[in-house]
């Protein structure tokens, strides 16, 4: 079927903030979105599944400074480095069609156009922000919105904030947003609506700060370069720029927008259900059809948080128990719209009970009996039985109606309920084995061979239907399942899941390895605890520092003039592989030029706007035909025999020309 003839379905995760490695909570949302995307592809829809990373902001800038790298280097490591975001989604078998980074050039250019359009239509204006700011959440608050003087979202300390800023006229759209929330199914589950209306809209929506001047790591406002676009515009519009809005990178905005679903954690429902639709209204753009705010995975009763350090590493669990087992656990165990308490014991128990005992045993016992009693191929005529037993009819009826029940739950964004329906059939099939007693029938094949073949066909067919509907959740395991029960691609379809008897009678059955081996609970918990303790005390790399220099007297030291400098421009020096040329503001009113041999450590564009330290009273010297008027300070060491260099970077609030003493 051509793309234009298929029903389109556009679904997104939030774009994650790469201030640290992602944890099991991020994995939960992404697996849920992936399962929904796979389900819609199974139905034959034209699916676009987007995820990505939100890479700008003060927190990233500060963490990069602490690490002695540029913000771009910092986020590159988290996103594309070993066991980074991209590696994690590959490991978890995430089938996203696109991945957006807000540092992508096409997104940057598009955001500048979007910001200007809202400014030109009067919905963005310049003013002064005075209030409170939560750096971990990157959220602004008024005094009245604080809870016990702390951030109402995360409960952490806030800081005073005062700076020139641009504001979005959020208050202008308050009535329209309230109507959207109260009178449509835009925001789900419904319990989120009262929270948004009562806590944010009815107390009075205030205009929203949408630019910052107190840090530089962001998209510059092109008509006022002292400002960078704040997260609300930069991050939220990713859902449209990734389709080609205001850029030539992609060309399917008109095809896929509006989104069918934004899946987001409940802590960012406010941004997606109030701020996001208001900005789209300002732009004259269609609104997404639904925002679904899922619950949190709790650890010891509290929310997991990178900044709190109480997170669970999905890499450890996936590598220990298997990717499909982890995917299944996340979707089977926790109602998607509610919070759930995570524990390793619960994970292992779910794997053992549902996957090893119920599903694994059904596949293993059925395929083993087909091999043992019929050499792997059932005889002709096994689909039908002249005198079916009541339990035959019960299994057939339950399995034949499974697809409709499953579909209703998936459409309601209740994957845990959809899986519950599948496992009702699996459990009924296991009971069917006990009721039909194939081993007893096999004692007299002449009298009971046809009946035995019919029983085993029923088991294979029930397993096939369950496998089709489990595939969005455990795709690799279902591929193995289909191979074992003799179900080729033609009977793995959505349509065939509703048609009992689709599997050919003579399709070969192969007894394969157990899909989900049982896990020794005590042993696994001991191993996980050992891993946790080892990761809590990371091995420090072998570091070598330069040898100490001979002592100098205080007067000699004081002759060196250390000054704070701001990078106005930076470029590579032609015909040099090592040198970068800096144009610096040293507070004197005249630009200072310094050449530094750090090209192998930094990209010049990443250093513009940074606050550095220079010795400014060294005699000028010629380098590659150009004059260098001083030296930038950096730290040099060897780590695992590799030389590392980090420029000394200071807080951007320190003015150019300030003397270090």
Please report, for each region that a protein language model flagged, where it lies by residue:
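Helix-rich, typically C-terminal accessory recognition domains appended to large enzymatic cores
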Residues: 126, 333, 338, 346-383, ...
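Intrinsic disorder at enzyme termini
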Residues: 481-558
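Structured secondary-structure scaffolds
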Residues: 2-51, 106-110, 154, 160-372, ...
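N-terminal catalytic cores of NTP/NDP-binding nucleotidyl/phosphoryl-transfer enzymes
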Residues: 2-74, 78, 100-115, 120, ...
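A glycine-rich helix N-cap at a beta->alpha junction
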Residues: 80-97
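Hydrophobic, well-ordered secondary-structure elements that form the walls
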Residues: 272, 301, 422, 459, ...
């Amino acid at each position: 079927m051509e793309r234009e003839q298929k029903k389109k379905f556009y679904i997104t995760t939030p774009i994650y903030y790469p201030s640290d490695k992602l944890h099991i909570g991020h994995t939960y949302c992404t697996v849920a979105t992936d399962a929904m995307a796979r389900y819609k592809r199974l139905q034959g829809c034209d699916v676009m599944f987007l995820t990505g990373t939100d890479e700008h902001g003060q927190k990233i800038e500060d963490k990069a400074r602490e690490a002695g790298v540029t913000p771009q280097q910092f986020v590159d490591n988290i996103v594309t480095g070993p066991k980074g975001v991209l590696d994690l989604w590959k490991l978890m078998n995430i089938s996203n069609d696109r991945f957006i980074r807000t540092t992508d050039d096409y997104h940057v250019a598009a955001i500048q156009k979007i910001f200007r359009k809202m400014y030109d239509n009067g919905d963005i204006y310049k003013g002064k922000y005075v209030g409170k700011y939560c750096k971990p959440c990157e959220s602004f608050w008024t005094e009245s919105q604080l809870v016990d003087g702390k951030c109402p979202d995360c409960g952490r300390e806030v800081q005073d904030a005062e700076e020139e800023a641009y504001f979005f006229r959020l208050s202008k759209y308050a009535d329209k947003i309230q109507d959207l929330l109260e009178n449509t199914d835009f925001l789900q589950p419904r319990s989120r609506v009262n929270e948004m209306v009562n806590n944010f809209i009815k107390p009075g929506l205030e205009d929203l700060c949408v630019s910052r001047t107190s840090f530089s790591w962001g998209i510059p406002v092109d008509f006022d370069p002292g400002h960078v676009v704040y997260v609300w515009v930069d991050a939220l519009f990713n859902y449209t720029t990734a389709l080609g809005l205001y850029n030539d990178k992609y060309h399917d905005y008109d095809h896929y927008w509006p989104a069918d679903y934004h899946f987001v954690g409940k802590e960012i429902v406010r941004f997606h259900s109030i701020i996001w639709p208001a900005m789209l209204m300002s732009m004259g753009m269609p609104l997404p059809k639904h925002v679904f705010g899922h619950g949190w995975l709790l650890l010891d009763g509290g929310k997991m948080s990178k900044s709190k350090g109480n997170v669970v590493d999905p890499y450890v669990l996936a590598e220990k128990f298997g990717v499909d087992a982890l995917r299944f656990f996340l979707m089977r165990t926790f109602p998607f719209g509610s919070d759930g308490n995570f524990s390793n014991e619960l994970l292992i128990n779910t794997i053992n009970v549902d996957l090893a005992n119920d599903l694994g045993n059904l596949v293993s016992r059925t395929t083993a009996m087909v091999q043992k009693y019929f050499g792997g191929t059932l005889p002709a005529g096994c689909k039908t039985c002249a005198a079916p037993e009541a339990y035959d009819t019960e299994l057939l009826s339950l399995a034949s109606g499974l697809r409709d029940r499953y579909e209703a739950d998936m459409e309601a964004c209740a994957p845990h309920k959809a899986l519950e329906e599948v496992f009702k059939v699996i459990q009924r099939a296991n009971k069917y084995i006990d009721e039909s007693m194939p081993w007893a029938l096999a004692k007299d094949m002449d009298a009971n061979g046809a009946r035995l073949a019919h029983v085993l066909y029923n088991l294979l067919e029930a397993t096939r239907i369950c496998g089709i509907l489990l595939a969005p959740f455990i795709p690799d395991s279902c591929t193995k399942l289909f191979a074992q029960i003799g179900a080729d691609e033609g009977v793995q379809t959505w349509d065939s899941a509703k048609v009992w008897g689709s599997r050919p009678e003579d399709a070969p059955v192969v007894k394969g390895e157990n899909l989900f081996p049982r896990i020794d609970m005590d042993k696994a918990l001991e191993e996980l605890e050992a891993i946790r303790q080892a990761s809590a005390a990371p091995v420090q790399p072998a570091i070598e520092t330069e040898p100490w220099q001979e002592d100098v007297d205080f007067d000699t030291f004081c002759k060196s003039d250390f000054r704070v400098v701001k990078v106005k421009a930076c470029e590579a020096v032609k015909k040099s592989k090592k040198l970068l040329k800096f144009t610096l503001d040293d507070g004197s009113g005249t630009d200072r030029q310094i050449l530094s041999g750090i090209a192998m450590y930094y990209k010049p564009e990443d250093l513009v706007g940074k606050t550095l330290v220079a010795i400014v009273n060294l005699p000028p010297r010629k380098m590659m035909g150009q004059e260098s008027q001083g030296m930038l300070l950096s730290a040099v060491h060897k780590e695992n025999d590799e030389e590392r260099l980090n420029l000394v970077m200071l807080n951007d609030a320190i003015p150019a020309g300030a003397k270090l003493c």
